[in-house]
Amino acid sequence: MQAPERLRQQQFALAKHIRDPEANLPPPDIEDRRLAIYRELFFNNVEGLLAGNFPVIREILDDDIWLDLVRAFYREHLCQTHLFPEVPREFIRFLETRIEQGEQDPAWLMELAHYEWVELALDLAENDEAENDANIVGDSILDTAFSLSSLAWPLGYQWPVHRLSPGFLPENPPSEPTFLLVRRDRDYKVHFEEISALIFRLLQLISDAPELTARQQLT
């Protein structure tokens, strides 16, 4: 066996052991004390990254539940990127998979995770330079076609995600959904605003058909 291939297999064995030491034996001839350092270092890096990006979830969940969730993500999820800013999005994909598998996570967990991720996603989003100002036609604003900025996201949730906290965790979602407009201003600050169902629907219509005038959108 050539040395590069042998090294590659050793690296894979080490990586599998670090991710799931209970199911994968370590490479031979490596002292467990040294392996323990790597196991703790790698896991703590991932846990710290997720805790920093999902602070409300981290605050709500008990330590054991949170660490078990992170451990499952660390052990089971195959990330599609090596970029650290994309790891929170991978965590959301992991939660989606858990829903499909019937895992008994809190009912609000997926939506709260998405809500917390949005701030990072919008903070890193690139502005669409091709966007134009409103195309004013005639003297009436109703005859103007508007387009929605790529840095303004209308979002709808079953749960009041902007209010969830250790002191406010309803057993069931309210009868009315929560609608939010999340936007990034020119100073790169992200803002969250609660909006009505009517405004949410109007923003959806503008996003779906920016070529239509306001008058056409309302008819």
Predicted regions mapped to residue ranges:
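Glycine-rich, acidic and aromatic/proline-enriched surface loops and short helix-turn segments
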Residues: 208
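Short acidic, hydrophobic short linear motifs in intrinsically disordered regions
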Residues: 202, 211-219
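Hydrophobic packing positions characteristic
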Residues: 75-201
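N-terminal, charged low-complexity regulatory/assembly segments
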Residues: 1-126
